A protein has these predicted regions:
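Short, ordered loop/turn segments at secondary-structure junctions
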Residues: 167, 351, 435, 458-462, ...
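Surface-exposed acidic, glycine-flexible loop patches that form ligand/cofactor-binding
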Residues: 152-156, 411-426, 525, 580, ...
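Metal-centered catalytic cores of metalloenzymes
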Residues: 331, 646-705, 709-779
């Protein structure tokens, strides 16, 4: 999220030529066709909101202040403790991650471009968390989304690695992902300051700036996937088995798999099909990457071989919109997602900071009267705040409407607003053509000339020289000023019909009317379509099951003055299936239950002074069975909660399960026909701990015992190794007891709930595939 003035100044200083932006709706294919010539470049500074960094920047510049908050309240959620970061200020805090007794908050200040990094928080006493350290980001860079601590055990490194992204706010800043050794959180050590895609490198840095990252270990190797903000191939995967020497493996553009929905690219705000966030999880033996691809929806990749990812499937947004059926097309904006505990579902979030969209752009007089495609700018005064909820009135052409200055030279002035005569309830509206200067500069020129509203029409290139005559682009804010009027955008065809002329679309052809030409009357109104919300998908089909939003996000009375009421992130409960936690900006922390019957809210928390939650994670302190919910508040720091609603209490204590073992139960067999034994298993889901006592009789001494997944007629995979030795155990004692820690909590919970889906198997040299076996059950 770069400061506007700083971003364009630093690029100019670097001598970077920013090409004309192409329209989001019609020029996605045109952009793609230019990739080879532009070396796969996707500009983050072209005012086309088609990268995560531009979405974040547009959020900062959104029209309608995000001040205010919902009244304080709570239900089934208790605040345990909270702590401000040092130097807390609005918008300083981003994501949260945790390991052991420490949490990590990414901290940034993109406008001033200083004091960015990661705050290290001691949470050993969750009632009294405190900042105990700070990892500084490279000057000119700042972290944000996708902070993570990954526990690695490879030939090259054993310990915990903090992973965070780098966006750029000043010359000297560096992109890519950063890897820090935080095995000793009080003494972090940089392993790799920056790594990523450096072919050909970033606009102003060696590595392309990135928006998010996610790391995982598969077998004896480790990897990280990053969001490349500067190329169409925005899925970048690196090997970090040796985190001090990362190796770039592969890059993908998921639009090559036709994931984009054309209707979404033509409607709503922040149109574009690009990567925003991702997670990776092993599901049924396949390492599966779940990618949130904005208007492309959610995408699954097989990354068993990260150097050669394989497309699995992608989702489609349903028509009409789930929560606003009166809206013809959904907003899109797939922002973040997680797999459910049992991998049957996906909980995804749509981030949407604009609760209104343009209902219609209408020419209301003359021979060409009718409705035409268009949009509303996100940083100007909202149409919905006008007295009648719309703009309507006479128009006049103002040319490019660019300011005269050293950069643009002498520009023809726009006509003064006094040139137009209006009736009561009408607005004086300037029509400008896209090009030469920033959209925001055109709007400021109109504002200074006394106009009540602006219409900015697309130019020939934006209309693909006639192939996309109705394509429009409501771009982002390009310079600092205070908007005081509304602005809408429309296509090049509507521009000519407005002035009753015929477009020629030729390259280099000037077919615009003379400055000062009076046009027909126009009308544009806003349609409330809600803030961003949550979607529940079936993981196998990627079909949507349900959608959810807080009540206020669906109410136009809360469109302004209550902060951002969009969801941001979801965190699936790691133990209890069907429970998840949501960071909901000004909507606070939300707790939902989900399943085949849909989504319902079961808890929430909003402080009396309001909250602004960005990140959310679940966490267990070492040797604790108490689940914590960690949330990062953008304006303060770390907040720690617990859910006090109904949960499965079996997961909070040791629960016993049993298996009677014999050789006749082996599948496919044979087992030892004389063998028998017993397994007593004690399971603690919240601790991720499995304790066992396994005894055997009338078999040769075993060298291993496992818990396998599978019903009684199945030879299933090992899920818990109880013991595994190179040589058989001594003849006596004919039993073994111990505890296994660090077992996946969701797995332990599933064994507790469904013991007959698992069995215990004992192996010896005579029967290496299994001497005796028995199905687990609840005694």
């Amino acid at each position: 999220m770069l400061g506007r003035t700083r971003r364009f100044a630093l690029l100019a200083a670097a001598g970077v030529l920013i090409a004309s932006a192409l329209p989001a709706a019609a020029a996605q294919k045109q952009q793609q066709s230019e990739q080879e010539a532009q070396e796969q470049r996707r500009s983050t500074t072209d005012q086309l909101i088609d990268t995560p960094v531009e979405v974040d920047a547009a959020h900062d510049d959104q029209h309608g202040a995000d001040e205010g908050h919902l009244p304080g309240s709570r239900h089934n959620v208790k605040r345990i403790g909270n702590a401000d970061i040092e130097g807390a200020a609005p918008g300083r805090v981003a994501d949260v991650s945790a390991f052991g007794n420490f949490a990590y908050l990414t901290v940034r200040d993109p406008e001033r471009c200083s004091d960015a990094g990661v705050a290290v928080m001691d949470i050993s006493d969750p009632r009294n968390p405190a900042q105990v350290g700070f990892i500084e980001a490279t000057e000119g860079s700042f972290p944000g989304e996708g902070s993570q601590v990954v526990d690695l055990d490879t030939a090259a490194f054993t310990g915990q690695v903090l992973v965070f992204n780098n966006e750029i706010c000043a010359l000297g800043g560096e992109g890519g992902v950063s890897l820090w050794d935080v095995t000793d959180p009080m003494n972090p050590v940089v392993l790799t300051a920056h790594t990523g895609d450096n072919d050909p490198g970033g606009f102003v840095s060696e590595f392309n700036q990135i928006h998010s990252s996610f790391a995982w270990q598969a077998g004896d190797k480790a990897y990280v996937v990053i969001v490349d903000d500067e190329e169409f191939t925005d899925v970048d995967i690196l090997e970090i088995t040796d985190p001090a020497n990362p190796v770039f493996l592969s890059e993908l553009d998921l639009n090559d798999f036709d994931v984009a929905q054309e209707e979404l690219l033509n409607n709503g705000n922040f149109q574009g099909s690009f990567l925003h966030d991702m997670v990776v999880k092993e599901i049924d033996g396949t390492w599966t990457m779940l990618l949130s691809y904005w208007d492309g929806g959610w995408v699954l990749l097989d990354v068993n071989d990260p150097a050669n990812p394989v497309f699995i499937n992608d989702s489609e947004y349903p028509y009409p919109d789930s929560l606003f059926p009166e809206v013809p097309f959904p907003e899109g904006n797939a922002h973040q997602a997680e797999f459910s505990t049992n991998d049957d579902f996906i909980i995804g979030t749509d981030e949407d900071f604009s609760p209104n969209r343009l209902d219609a752009f209408n020419i209301t007089s003359g021979p060409n009267a009718g409705a035409f495609p268009g949009g509303e700018f996100g940083f100007t005064v909202p149409l919905a705040t006008y007295p009648d909820g719309e703009i309507n009135g006479p128009t006049i052409y103002g040319g490019l409407a660019c300011p005269s200055n050293e950069e643009y030279g002498d520009q023809p002035p726009v006509p003064d607003a006094s040139s137009l005569t209006v009736e009561p309830g009408e607005e004086k509206i300037l029509v400008a053509l896209r090009g030469l200067c920033f959209f925001s500069e055109k709007i400021e020129v109109a504002q200074q000339a006394g106009y009540d509203a602006v219409v900015i029409a697309n130019h020939h290139a934006g209309a693909a020289f006639g192939d996309a005559p109705d394509a429009s682009l409501c771009g982002s804010q390009g310079h600092e000023f205070t908007p005081e009027i509304a602005a809408v955008c429309t296509g090049h065809r509507a521009f000519h019909l407005l002035f009753n002329t015929t477009p020629e679309y030729g390259e280099g052809v000037d077919d615009a009317p003379a400055i000062g030409t009076l046009g027909e009357d126009v009308q544009a109104s806003a349609l409330f379509d809600g803030w961003g919300y949550v979607r529940l998908l079936d993981r196998s089909s990627l079909e949507q099951i349900d959608a959810y939003a807080i009540d206020e996000a669906l109410d136009p009375d809360f469109a302004f003055g209550f902060g951002d009421l969009s969801v941001h992130e979801a965190a699936a409960d790691p133990v209890e299936q069907g429970l998840a936690y949501l960071s909901y900006y000004s909507g606070g922390l939300r707790v939902i239950r989900y399943g085949n019957n849909g989504i319902r809210e079961v808890g929430h928390y909003i402080h009396k002074d309001g909250n602004n939650f960005w990140g959310v994670e679940t966490h267990f302190l070492p040797d604790s069975n108490k689940k914590l919910i960690l949330a990062s508040d953008r304006d303060s720091g770390l907040w720690i909660f617990k859910f006090t609603g109904r949960t499965d209490k079996r997961f909070e204590r040791f629960v016993g399960r049993k298996a009677n073992l014999n050789g006749t139960k082996e599948v496919p067999g044979p087992g030892d026909p004389d063998g028998k034994g017993m397994a007593r298993i004690r399971l603690h889901a919240n601790r991720g701990e499995v304790c066992y006592r396994v005894s055997w009789d009338k078999i040769g001494s075993p060298f291993a015992a496992h818990i396998h997944e599978g019903r009684s007629d199945v030879a299933g995979p090992v899920v818990v190794t109880l013991f595994q030795e190179e040589q058989p155990r001594p003849d006596k004692p004919r039993r073994m007891r111990d505890c296994v820690a660090g077992v996946d909590r969701a797995l332990v919970a599933d064994i507790v709930k469904s013991p007959r889906d698992y069995y215990v198997n004992v192996h010896n040299p005579e029967f290496p595939a299994g001497a005796i076996r028995g199905q687990l059950f609840n005694p």
